[in-house]
């Protein structure tokens, strides 16, 4: 059955009895117990598997969503031309139609590539050595170790300091609440927040907390979109997150559809990966306490590679410069209350 929108989670609306029971014993702000080490290199295998899963997340997102957002912009431009008389109207209309046609072709090409990647993932799902295969470019591994260590320390320190606020943001369900919370805490608009939420999704699914995973996945994709929008527009993320919420609340055609599609795709990939053998050692051998899911203690067992972080949060909204330039009243500096 198709999931309702917004996705199920700890909403203010009445919840099913099963959902309430599932989340009733969940501490939103748990302590941070250390995750026990796996024997025989199991932790390293688990971490490497998480890295590959996040690499695939970037590949899927960049291939599908980028085309959809570009297509939405081209269609908006095409529609606006019909409302304005101009000597070159026919010429501009032809150019816009050509752009739409080209983007549709690119979208179809990416869709075929995405289907091929899904099939390959399913074929390798239960392979015991799947996580050690060279599925993607390994250039991210051969980075300067000193820089990696510094970035790891910075990322870990941020998540330790603001863990409760990140988790609070993850539990918000309304657009207005999320925007208001980020306005009050603009420092949370960063890659570390997106990374934390993504990892939290994997562990919630491993603990069979599907409804809560869907809620956190929604907020993880929100942060991914905001970060990529800022990156492509070359502005501070804290200065453009209102533009994202503006489009989300208005449910602008094309843009909102791309967000919903990516959210569903991300949740599907989380479920698929949690079934793979690369995820089993942590969930079966360690018996991770359910109160520690998503905590810093658990995250410390996962890879903190800066390129892994980049791969996790690099979703595609690839040509939003034109959109931002249209918003004359949108500040290109830190967003304030």
Swiss-Prot record:
Superkingdom of source: Eukaryota
Key words, A-Z: Chaperone, Coiled coil, Cytoplasm, Phosphoprotein
Modified positions (Phosphoserine) in chain numbering: 32, 88
GO CC annotation, single: platelet dense granule lumen
This protein's record includes keyword Metal-binding: no
UniProt-annotated stretches for the region Self-association: 2-171
Coiled coil: 84-122
Chain spans, region Disordered: 1-40
SMART domains per UniProt: CDC37_M
Subcellular location as annotated: Cytoplasm
Region (Required for interaction with STIP1): 278-337
One MF annotation (Gene Ontology) recorded for this entry: unfolded protein binding
Gene Ontology terms: biological process: protein folding; protein stabilization
Protein name from the UniProt record: Hsp90 co-chaperone Cdc37-like 1
Species of provenance: Homo sapiens
Lineage, highest ranks first: Eukaryota, Metazoa, Chordata, Craniata, Vertebrata
